[in-house]
Amino acid sequence: MTAIIDIVGREILDSRGNPTVEVDVVLEDGSFGRAAVPSGASTGAHEAVELRDGGSRYLGKGVEKAVEAVNGKIFDAIAGMDAESQLLIDQTMIELDGSANKGNIGANAILGVSLAVAKAAAQATGLPLYRYVGGANAHVLPVPMMNIINGGAHADNPIDFQEFMILPVGASSVREAVRYGSEVFHTLKKRLKDAGHNTNVGDEGGFAPNLKNAQAALDFIMESIEKAGFKPGEDIALGLDCAATEFFKDGNYVYEGERKTRDPKAQAKYLAKLASDYPIVTIEDGMAEDDWEGWKYLTDLIGDKCQLVGDDLFVTNSARLRDGIRMGVANSILVKVNQIGSLSETLDAVETAHKAGYTAVMSHRSGETEDSTIADLAVATNCGQIKTGSLARSDRTAKYNQLIRIEEELGKQARYAGRNALKFL
């Protein structure tokens, strides 16, 4: 009854207007699953590879080759398989690709099928996706990391850090957390406008004002939190995504906006000072993806009092994560389904992190769609934290809205992670 009888891949557009892969999977009993694949702007060198067409069509970014793989090789390989055999299906596709980075048939092709299979199987069993994937104990609603000021590769402004985030740790529910975020977001918009700044939004829905440095961005956010009636650090904490690989050049961190250069130790000390001066509880990619010594220095410096998240460092890859665990580097992993390219490997990365005492943060990409799968996966894994952008743009709010629905559906079983999501609070 849960045998796969049809798979249809198609080319659709993501939130940046670039092509991406969408996949429909149909089972023998008529159950149906659909998944759309996200895409990043600042991508780690060690990520699984999206298959793009090249040439002039869509300026080289077309995904017809990946769609062809879905409708051809992948369908031929997994047609008739039981959709509930997720691991076997994912392994079959990985072996079909045959490369270390999924570059032959494309991580975007494999992931689209992997997620659509899980959704179809969930429908066949009569369970919501978070319950199907996570089992009976899936009940923790994640604290959102809301990206309200954008810089770096996500915006055209002088700020070198990529994201400045708020975390509503003091809220009592995800519904309240979304309200906290929305009120701060709109307060920030007014304050930026009153100060003469542009209030257009970046790729992830946050504002992209021309501010001179990170401190200026953090000051605006702190003022907006207070003006909205909340207490910084108590109701709402702060987070950074430095995306440091983007400005790591010849062994140093080159801040073009500030016209400063910091060596790895100076970079770590700068981040430590920011975390001391502001209620910053999480820093993502504070060091570059291959600056293992810098990461170790940063972890030794503030790893006992701040969440240090590896994104480009770990790329949702259990093998790289195990290297980091062994070296005592970072204390958290960012989880992006398209970095590794299959649901099974994504779940394995979360499990590896939790076993080692590392936290895990479920995450979107800057190029998103209306697909809200990551909201379900955040609850399924009880990871307690989610990064899915700002409080604007429907490609971002779709995930918040899904979390609100899940919380409502869980009723009294639902538990908002709140301050418990971060061991340092």
Swiss-Prot record:
Active-site residues (renumbered): 204, 336
Stored PROSITE patterns: ENOLASE (PS00164)
Gene3D superfamilies according to UniProt: Enolase-like C-terminal domain, Enolase-like, N-terminal domain
Gene: eno
Binding site for (2R)-2-phosphoglycerate: 162, 336, 365-366, 387
Annotated disulfide bonds: none
InterPro entries to which the protein is assigned, alphabetical: Enolase, Enolase-like_C_sf, Enolase-like_N, Enolase_C, Enolase_CS, Enolase_N
Molecular function GO labels: magnesium ion binding; phosphopyruvate hydratase activity
Cofactor requirements of the protein: Mg(2+)
Name of the protein in question: Enolase
Pfam families: Enolase_C, Enolase_N
Organism: Brucella anthropi (strain ATCC 49188 / DSM 6882 / CCUG 24695 / JCM 21032 / LMG 3331 / NBRC 15819 / NCTC 12168 / Alc 37) (Ochrobactrum anthropi)
